[in-house]
Amino acid sequence: MVCTEERNMIMANGTKFSTGNHPVEMGLPMLHFINAGFDIEIVTPTGGSAKIEMWAMPEKDDAVLKLYRDYADAFENPGSLTDFAANSMTDDAPYIAVFLPGGHGAMLGLPDNPDLGKLLHWAHNRDLFTLAICHGPAALLAANKGEPSAYIYHGYKIAAFPDAVDRQTPLIGYMPGHMPWQFGEKLNELGVTIINSKADNSCHLDRRLISGASPKAANNFGRLAASTLLDVVRSR
């Protein structure tokens, strides 16, 4: 699971928005993976602590709260994606998927990270799954090598948080300014189609890429991803 280690997004008007990975979009899928018997290894670009949008923590969800207590040390002391890319991407590595959790923090330090680009290409070439929810698909941009037709997700369809909804968030007071850039627009330019127009519970499976649209999709996304991964394990 690749988390962000950056806290502040600089908005188009120069203000700062405190962000990170969204606790529901990350936590609910994690619970499904753990209940299905999978281990989760957490990394950030350099091994700095994973940043979480604690203001979005579901304070009445005991299972999610326990998850974050249990994984507190792993979030505070994650592995380094740089080290992982250098040492762990072997033919016999025991991984089945790469998880890119949501939160606006997924747009910070990941979309242009060369080590994440290597990881996504490695996973794609080994037929591993890639899982991304809400703003997590922004990190898929790391796999871009410059030619849209050669982009590994060219022609794919995904569910993701729509740019049009992000443009509305300052109007309702959710964010202090407009987004500095639109990740959906950049994915569209690379040949990716976003299937949903609302921040709803849409989930989508296209080949080995599983995606979800928003926090509303987190439970169904986690269920779809976990069941799909289990089907692969059982078929081996």
Residue ranges and their predicted role:
Residues 132-137:
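Short, thiol/selenol-centered motifs that function as redox-active sites or metal-ligating centers
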